[in-house]
Amino acid sequence: TSTGENECGFFWGAYLNRNECYDETNGEPDVIKALIEILLDRHLVKYNSSDARAITQKKAEEPITPQEAIMRTEGTVFPVADIKDYLESIGPKKEAFLSFHFIGELIYNNFGEFFWIPTWDKFPLRAYDSSDTDRSGCLEIFEMPSKNANGEIPRGRYIAGIDPIDADTGASLFSIFVMDTFTDRIVAEYTGRPRLANDAYEISLRLLKFFNAEANYEKNLKGLFSYFDARNCLHYLCNTPQVLKDMDMVKSTNLYGNNAKGTHANLEINKWGRLLQAQYMSTRYNEGDEEDLSLKLHHIRTIPYLEECIAWNSDGNFDRVSAMGMLFI
C-alpha cells in the first residue's frame, strides 16, 4: 500500500529456475520438465534413505509450494513431509475416513462386564489445537478388540501408553493410546481433559480392561498409580521396561510401589521415545509384499496425533506424542 504498512512475500518455486529446464525456443522455464525431475529426485530420496528427515530436507531445499519452503528441517525426528502428504490425502475424504471409527463410552452391566455404547453428545478432540473447544473428549476406537477361539483377548496382544494428568485443573491433556501388537496398528485413543482427573483415570482403566491391555505410563505424576492401586488394578500397569535398565536410563535397584511401575520421563527418555515413533512411521507396513509400499504411518488413524508430530518443538506441550512415546518404549 501507499503507507507501506502491509508486508508481502514472493515465492520462487524450484521449478522456475532449474538448470537445463528451459524452453529452447523462447527461453521460458520448462515447468513440466523441472517438476518431473524434482519429483523423481524426491522419490529416490524417500525410498533409498534410512533417515526419516531426508525427504523433508529435500523438499525444503527444492520447494514446490510455499509450505515446503518453510518446513522445519532441524529439531524434530518426525518424517514431517510424509506426514503432511498423508494428511493431505485424507483431507478430501475426511468424513468417510472418520466414519469407520467408533465413538462412545464403556459401561458396566449388572454382571460387572463392559459393553460399548455409542454417544451422540460427546466428541473426540480431532484437532491438535483444541483450546477453544470443550476439551472433555471421549473414547475413539479404530478397531474393536479381537478375541481368540475361546472368546478371550490374549494377554500381551494389546499394549498402551499413557501421558497422565494429576490435578483437576490445568492446560495439559490426558492421553492414552492402545496398540495391537499382532498388526502393529493403533486401535484406540482417549485424549481429553475431563472435569476431574479421576474421570480420566477411570476412562483409561476401562479401556485397558476392554482390550485386556497393559500400559506404560509417565510416573512423574502419582495420581494414576494411586487410582489403580486403590482398585487392585496394578496388573494393568507395566513394570518399568527392562530396556530402560539395560540402557542405563533408569536405576534398577530397590524399585517398589510406584517406582516399580511405568517410566520416569526425562529428556533422554522422551527423546528416545520420539525416535521410536519416527522409526515406526518410516517402516514399511508389509515388508513381505513388494507391491505394498505403504508405511506404518499410513495406517495411523488419529489425525491430531499426526498434527502434533508436525508441530512438535522442544518448547511446546505435546501430550499425544508423550503418550505414544510411553507406548513404544
Which functions belong to the PLM regions below?
Residues 3-6, 12, 21-240, 282-329:
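RNase H-like, metal-dependent nuclease domains and their acidic two-metal-ion catalytic environment used
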Residues 16-18:
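OB-fold/S1-family RNA-binding modules
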Residues 20-23, 247-249:
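Short, solvent-exposed polar/charged micro-motifs at secondary-structure junctions
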Residues 236-287:
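Short alpha-helix plus adjacent loop in nuclease-associated cores
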